[in-house]
């Protein structure tokens, strides 16, 4: 699990599994990918080197990732568009999650392809799978939003977001306020059979971004 900067956690992870050549899942924290496009592009280059190290050790890799900062950025941008253009309907958060999966997956798969080619590895494809998750509609998490998304705000900004947009805002570890959304427990992955097929065909699969849609 990567929750901080990408380089050291990935190095430690590699050292721990070097003697266990098997199929592994790597989870990249959304915060570790940065808050801007340049930060994300720099982070995925470091991450790609560590992942390809694992592949050279004989591991098959599936990559999952968070999306808190990224989906918040996308959601804010789409909400601003709706406010400026009355003919533009509001974009559901589910669609914003799909956008974030594609945005993060695009950078990750390009960084992985580049690193594979740099090492002369040409026979391992990389694919991003937009992934949906089944949940229980009665999950109490829908009544108690807890997943932070987007950027940090001051208390005054958070109060404005609550009043103007109906967001649920909570203080986040003394660093400021962030919007929180429901995070129900996953029941099953809709696209799991396709993911399994891709992995069995020796693809590096980037999937379940942000926990799925």
Please tell me what each predicted stretch does.
Residues 81-207:
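Ligand-binding beta-strand-loop-alpha-helix segment within the catalytic cores
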Residues 18-64, 73-83, 92, 197-202:
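N-terminal glycine-/serine-/threonine-rich phosphate-binding loop
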Residues 32-34, 68-72, 134-138, 213:
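Short, active-site-adjacent cap segments at secondary-structure transitions
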Residues 65-67, 130:
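Glycine-rich, histidine-containing beta strand-loop boundary motifs that form or position
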Residues 49-52, 59, 69, 102, ...:
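N-terminal, well-ordered alpha-helical segments
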Residues 1-17:
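Short, Lys/Arg-enriched N-terminal segments with co-localized hydrophobic residues
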Residues 27, 131, 213:
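Glycine- and acidic-rich phosphate- and metal-coordinating loops
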Residues 209-211:
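Histidine- and/or cysteine-centered catalytic micro-motif in compact active-site loops
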């Amino acid at each position: 699990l990567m929750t901080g900067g990408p380089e050291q956690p990935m190095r430690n992870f590699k050292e721990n599994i070097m003697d266990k050549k098997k199929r592994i899942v790597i989870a990249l924290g959304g915060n570790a990918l940065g808050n801007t496009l340049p930060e994300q592009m720099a982070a995925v280059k470091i991450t790609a080197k560590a992942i390809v190290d694992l592949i050279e050790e004989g591991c098959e890799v599936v990559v999952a990732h968070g999306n808190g900062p990224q989906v918040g950025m996308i959601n804010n941008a789409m909400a601003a568009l709706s406010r400026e253009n009355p003919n533009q309907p509001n974009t559901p958060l589910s669609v914003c999650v799909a956008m974030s999966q594609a945005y993060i997956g695009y950078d990750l798969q390009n960084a992985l392809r580049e690193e594979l080619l740099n090492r002369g590895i040409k026979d391992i494809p990389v694919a991003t799978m937009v992934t949906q998750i089944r949940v229980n509609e009665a999950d109490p998490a829908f009544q108690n939003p807890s997943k932070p998304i987007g950027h940090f705000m001051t208390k005054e900004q958070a109060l404005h977001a609550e009043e103007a947009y109906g967001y649920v805002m909570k203080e986040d570890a003394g660093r400021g306020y962030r919007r929180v959304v429901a995070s129900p427990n996953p029941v099953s992955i809709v696209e799991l059979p396709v993911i399994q097929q891709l992995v069995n065909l020796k693809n590096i699969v980037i999937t379940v971004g942000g926990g799925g849609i």
